[in-house]
């Protein structure tokens, strides 16, 4: 019996994360009853069936994971292997990326390329609802899957997450609210806290909560993205997690300054809206370049 119990214990990692705690409790009860001399044959049979069912569900999700492709023109693509290695080898990674680097849309795909997202969701937070919806739409398009399928989002008054969902976009407020009913956040295998430099009250609460949760969830990966504003502070908060810096993609910008009125113009002839229209018309006539 002890050999069977140990074998079942080892199989827990073959199950989805959200099933492991309940199955572990049932296994612990069976072990306690066996030590007390009570019959456990029926309990072990039921546990074996439950483990088989959960393991099959995980196997099917893993086989159905989308295969991502990457745009080599994005700056983050040059760092893809380093980012993947850091995620694989560390529980917490801080990614410092400028606007236009591609970090928001490519990070979930890098996680998918590592096989993450089968045992639990890849949760991806955004500070605002419109950003959560638009990022979900973009990632779904890049993966070639309909929105609400393998890529979904959940914001206030709108829930497009289904049983097939692998990547879940949401506001940081939604994730914070979920800690009330899912204190160990067991539906997630990866959490990406995007735009953490904004330091809203929700983000600060989440970072504090996750700091305490991670030791109890060694199977949870945490990725924090920040602009180039003191990323070392986030690293220190999470026990000196590795920091990876990614440059942004920039374009030349020409700045032109002009007075509202030229010296020879009458003040009554042109107000601010008209001056703006004249400036736009001038740029339009000149064309791109």
Regions found by a protein language model. Give the residues of each.
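P-loop NTPase motor module signature
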Residues: 1-289
